């Protein structure tokens, strides 16, 4: 998906995004890219994985979000909420590069100004969050997750879980004014 813009409020259950609800590849030989796209309105999920650009990236190959902007607030009544992407689980390389999120982010847990939750447990996995900015006012987590009881909210990546893969957060900034949590 390249050079597109949405100017509508988006509502949905799981995997809700301003440009793509679900982004990914079924095999290692394929690549998915969202590039030079803008989402101008709010994105609201009533389930898991809500993002200003992509709700979820689940990929066996490589997936990229490049040079995108999300202007609206991003919220969900459940988990994994991000200003750009709600949820990343990858067996290949996944990158968020050169993106800006301007809206407030709110969810139950794993809430981040750029990415809500990123998991990189496969040896071939690489997750890069680079050259990106969260310029919203507020990130809020209203509950906790069942596995460890933590609320997990931050201006960049709410929960970054790395096993045998590699993850990098490089040259990013958060201009968040308030991070609110309820719980641990």
Language-model regions: role of each:
Residues 1-184:
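Predominantly extracellular beta-rich ligand-binding scaffolds that present long acidic/polar faces
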């Amino acid at each position: 998906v390249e050079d597109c813009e949405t100017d509508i409020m988006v509502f949905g259950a799981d995997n809700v995004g301003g440009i793509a609800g679900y982004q990914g590849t079924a095999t290692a030989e394929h690549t998915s890219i969202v590039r030079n796209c803008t989402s101008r309105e709010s994105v609201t999920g009533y389930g898991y994985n809500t993002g200003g650009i992509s709700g979820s990236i689940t990929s066996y190959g490589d997936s990229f979000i490049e040079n995108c902007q999300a202007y609206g607030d991003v919220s969900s009544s459940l988990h994994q909420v991000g200003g750009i992407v709600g949820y990343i689980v990858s067996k290949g390389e996944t990158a968020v590069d050169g993106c800006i999120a301007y809206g407030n982010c709110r969810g139950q847990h794993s809430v981040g100004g750029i990415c809500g939750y990123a998991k990189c447990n496969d040896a071939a996995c690489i997750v890069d969050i680079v050259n990106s900015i969260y310029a919203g006012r507020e990130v809020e987590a209203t509950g906790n997750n069942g596995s460890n009881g933590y609320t997990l909210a931050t201006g960049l990546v709410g929960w970054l879980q790395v096993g045998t893969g590699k993850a990098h957060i490089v040259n990013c900034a958060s201009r968040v004014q308030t991070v609110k949590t309820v719980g641990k």
